[in-house]
């Protein structure tokens, strides 16, 4: 309720400036005496039916924060207080870089969407490593999303991913490999089989050298064809990827009403949801949930999260939803999700995962 009073004021600011204001508030309140306990009492809500396991990690619920919201890894404690089960920080590059010039983040309220062309603005792996060591909360699972520096030639991209992996994997619960941002020139060429195999082979080699190897997830683009996505999934499975994150932002613009619809960058939010679910279903049908899918794109309500789960996602993440619904979004989605599961006779998220993909597959086979 309070956020809906504040939101009109925030929406008068440039979108990136508003994000900075909100995250500064999050950062401050999580460090004040007594306030964290009060915030947790207001926003934390869990239900045993929502518990999910993946790669030896236990998630209190399937709902997490997607990469992009906390690029510096200094909001983990605050986001844990709001009731998210996991936070994916980043994208993190080896060296600090400013990203693209502003303005570079745009709200599309008519479409419940955002367009960003941030361009991997990053404080670099050294600063993020320091922030991860300083975090207080250990009850939230932390993933690190890694990418390459803009000025690194594509033929040397593996070196960037490897350096960031070595620096940050020991400090994280899992690592997400971002090959799909539309805002770094040439990055999506890493979806090509030979380049992807080289990248994953090196990361797996480094991972096997860790005392405790980390699950590695691969974040993919929604703008590839289903045949191309199948090729990426097969390469990932052969390499030993532990999950696929579907999807990143899209370059598509169909059906948008906002006057800002033609801004350059990746589109997120409600318009992405149908395509994200299509990709989630496609991956689930290929893998049968092993490795699982982490669903991202257009999650603003419990119904959205539930649709992703039924399409095949074991975990779901959001970012744009926080902009429009505010800090109570995790609590509201989890409450609604528990009700939806019980309404349909499911005792757990796992039981509901992929039921729509399986049903549609069965229909096609009979047809």
Swiss-Prot record:
It is a peripheral membrane protein. SUPFAM superfamilies: FMN-linked oxidoreductases. It comes from the Bacteria. GO terms for cellular component: cytoplasm; plasma membrane. The active site is at 181 (nucleophile). One of its GO terms (biological process) is 'de novo' pyrimidine nucleobase biosynthetic process. It is an enzyme of class 1 (oxidoreductase). Its EC number is 1.3.5.2. GO terms for molecular function: dihydroorotate dehydrogenase (quinone) activity. Binds 1 FMN per subunit. FMN binds at residues 67-71, 91, 145, 178, 219, 247, 269, 298, 319-320. Belongs to the dihydroorotate dehydrogenase family. Type 2 subfamily. This is Dihydroorotate dehydrogenase (quinone). The gene is pyrD.
